[in-house]
């Protein structure tokens, strides 16, 4: 197993490149929350796989970001990267401790399952209120 250590402004981000059957693991401190489904670990942007949070100008957008800031900002996370990339972001499932960040924000009613990418693993955590208030983007279907 190879390990690459990146130092970024007094911050350590550690990436383990596993074998072909295991995901690449990135660990580090969350330095910025862009919105409800995108965080930055060190200077590396991560898009939460299978999670669709509202944009900042949409209903619940600012609440979803505030929830995410409270949950992860300044905390150590572990992200299992899929190998995919969207825009400038790597894609992965991230955990703070044993808590799946995607499960947490969807259970709170501030994001939806994006079944095209999640395989439906978060659907059971969606709330009725979120289903009424958040518009699922076409790319999630």
Regions found by a protein language model. Give the residues of each.
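Sec-dependent signal peptide recognition
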Residues: 1-7
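Small beta-barrel nucleic-acid-binding modules, primarily SNase/OB-fold domains
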Residues: 2, 12-141
């Amino acid at each position: 197993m190879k390990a690459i250590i990146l130092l970024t402004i007094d911050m350590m981000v550690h990436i383990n490149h596993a074998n072909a059957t295991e995901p690449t693991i990135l660990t580090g401190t969350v330095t910025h929350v862009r919105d409800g489904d995108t965080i930055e670990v060190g200077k590396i942007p991560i898009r939460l796989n299978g999670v669709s949070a509202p944009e900042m100008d949409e209903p619940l957008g600012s609440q979803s970001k505030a929830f995410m800031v409270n949950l992860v900002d300044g905390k150590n996370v572990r992200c299992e990267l899929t190998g995919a990339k969207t825009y400038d972001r790597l894609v992965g499932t991230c955990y703070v401790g044993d808590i799946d960040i995607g499960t947490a924000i969807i259970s709170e009613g501030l994001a939806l399952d994006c079944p095209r990418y999640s395989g439906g693993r978060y659907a059971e955590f969606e709330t009725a209120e979120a289903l009424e208030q958040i518009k699922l983007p076409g790319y999630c279907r």
